[in-house]
Every structure is written in structure tokens, then in C-alpha cells.
């Protein structure tokens, strides 16, 4: 790159309100995700973070890599062809995942499993994005794990825009 405003990567919007549009991000874009990782995901150098997001989705880099590495966290990357809830529970159990981010639908499927089969004691923080959170999913996850689901909102065009940070009390379904 010759300058910070050179194009670093291109993503396409989901096309929710029309045709997908190309979004260019420059080389300063990863810096915006220091907030994502350090405050929303609540990561530090002792963290092992897992985000479930397809690499074609902007969330893949802003939820898995940029801020997380800048914050010094360890990143667990899992590539799968088909989502299986037991695989996620097994990964948390086997690898000691400490921080986990996924769309609310993932948590809806996880709470349907027999979670008592897995030691999830290393998991200390969970974040969600990508769709609305059903308050009943929040309550059941909290009951089963003791962990609050912290919502966040961002877009392909931006970084994390608004979130429930560790010092805030969640209001399930408010985003």
C-alpha cells in the first residue's frame, strides 16, 4: 500500500434493500475493530476466541481476525460445510474456548442439545450479531451457562456500530 486510503479489501452488502453493493475498505479499517475485540468481545491475551461467520461475510474479518489479533487474543478458526450444534459444543469443550460469537440462531440450536454432556467452564463471554435475539433464547442460554449474550450491530460498510459492552446490562432483543 502506498497510503492508508488505498483499498485493502472489498465486500458486498447483503442486498437487503436492493441489489448488493460493493464496499471498499482502506488499510485503516482493521483499527476500528480494536473496539470490537477489546470491548465488545471482551478479549485479552489470555482469550481463545471463536466467531462463527462465513468468510464471504464481513463479520468474518471483523469478528475473527483484525481486532482480535490487534488485542493480542488467540483466535480459533473452524471451517465447516454444515453447521452441527454438537460440533460447536465439542470444540468449546475440547479446546477451552473462552469467548464465542455467533448469530442468535446458533444459540437457539445449542440450547436444544444436552449441554450437560460438555464441560463449558472455560467459556466466559458470548456475543451475538446478524439477526434479532429472541429473549427466550437469551434466558435459556443464561440459565444453562450463567453467561449473558451481549448483542452487537454493525454493517458491511462500517465497523461495530452499537453494542452491549461488558459494563452494560443486556436488553435481549433490543437491537
Feature locations, PLM:
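Conserved pre-ATP/AMP-binding loop-to-beta segment of ANL
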Residues: 1-12, 19, 42-48
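Conserved AMP-binding A3 loop
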Residues: 8-32
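Short beta-strand->loop structural element characteristic of the AMP-binding/adenylate-forming
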Residues: 21-24, 74-81, 150
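Alpha-helix/helix-capping structural signal
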Residues: 28, 105-108, 131-132
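Gly/Ser/Thr-rich phosphate-binding loop
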Residues: 70, 97-101, 111-172
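Short Gly/Pro-enriched turn/cap motifs at secondary-structure boundaries
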Residues: 2, 173-175
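Conserved S/T- and glycine-rich ATP-binding loop of Class I adenylate-forming
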Residues: 7, 13-16, 49, 92, ...
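Conserved AMP-binding/adenylation subdomain of ANL enzymes
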Residues: 31-48, 52-98, 113
